[in-house]
């Protein structure tokens, strides 16, 4: 009888050790990070180089075996080298990617889709940033693989200037978005006139 108990116990131990099938992006390699916070539009002291943009962002992660944010962060660290869009708006694209990937993904077949739709305020330092009235339609595919894993990122960002009341994009410096911006080397500086606002340097 003891022998049978040992066999049953051993089988139970084996069952608990088996990895469960991947049904959601694994997040065991990430500390939980709070979502970004948005500050409603207010009166800015400085009006220079300020633009209100209606944003649509989508990042589709294609991976047959699931993925971790460690891999996504690894891919995004080389973003400056692989970005193929309008370089006057690369800072805006980085902001949108970070905010998009901070949301909750929706499964779509073997893919995971992150989406963002929002009106955001952007301020650029000096004479940087897009031209007046300039819009952006950017799509790009980035793939990464080694002997064990394949991950593809399909990025789409559209931005058009609009007059809908917007929000400052983020003040929560401990959010995942800020972690991803750091990985992409987003260049910003704090606004001297508006303490809640960051000026884009790219």
Curated annotation (Swiss-Prot):
Its main location: virion. Residues 1-33 are annotated as: Disordered. It comes from the Viruses. It holds the Pfam family Rhabdo_M2. Residues 115-151 are annotated as: Essential for glycoprotein binding. It is found in: Virion membrane; Host endomembrane system; Host cytoplasm. GO terms for biological process: viral budding via host ESCRT complex. Most abundant protein in the virion. Plays a major role in assembly, budding and uncoating of virion after membrane fusion. Completely covers the ribonucleoprotein coil and keep it in condensed bullet-shaped form. Inhibits viral transcription and stimulates replication. Plays a major role in early induction of TRAIL-mediated apoptosis in infected neurons. Inhibits the integrated stress response (ISR) in the infected cell by blocking the formation of stress granules. Late-budding domains (L domains) are short sequence motifs essential for viral particle budding. They recruit proteins of the host ESCRT machinery (Endosomal Sorting Complex Required for Transport) or ESCRT-associated proteins. Matrix protein contains one L domain: a PPXY motif which potentially interacts with the WW domain 3 of NEDD4 E3 ubiquitin ligase (Potential). Homomultimer. Interacts with nucleoprotein and with the cytoplasmic domain of glycoprotein. Interacts with host ATP6V1A; this interaction plays an important role in virion uncoating after viral entry. This is Matrix protein. It comes from Rabies virus (strain China/DRV) (RABV).
């Amino acid at each position: 009888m003891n022998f049978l108990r040992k066999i049953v116990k051993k089988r139970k131990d084996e069952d608990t050790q088996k990895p469960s099938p991947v049904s959601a992006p694994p997040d065991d390699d990430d500390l939980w990070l709070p979502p970004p916070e948005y500050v409603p539009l207010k009166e800015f002291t400085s009006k220079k180089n300020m633009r209100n943009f209606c944003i649509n962002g989508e990042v589709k992660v294609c991976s047959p075996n699931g993925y971790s944010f460690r891999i996504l962060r690894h891919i995004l660290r080389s973003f400056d080298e692989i970005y193929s869009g309008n370089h006057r708006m690369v800072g805006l694209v980085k902001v949108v990617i970070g905010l998009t990937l901070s949301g909750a993904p929706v499964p779509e077949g073997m893919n995971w889709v992150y989406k963002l739709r929002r009106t955001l305020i952007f301020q650029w330092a000096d004479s940087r940033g897009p031209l007046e009235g300039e819009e952006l339609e950017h799509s790009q595919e980035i793939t990464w693989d080694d002997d064990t894993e394949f991950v593809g990122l399909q990025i789409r960002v559209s931005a058009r200037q609009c007059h809908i009341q917007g929000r400052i994009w983020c003040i929560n410096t401990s959010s995942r978005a800020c972690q991803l911006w750091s990985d992409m080397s987003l260049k910003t500086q704090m606004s001297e006139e508006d303490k809640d606002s960051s000026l884009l340097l790219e």
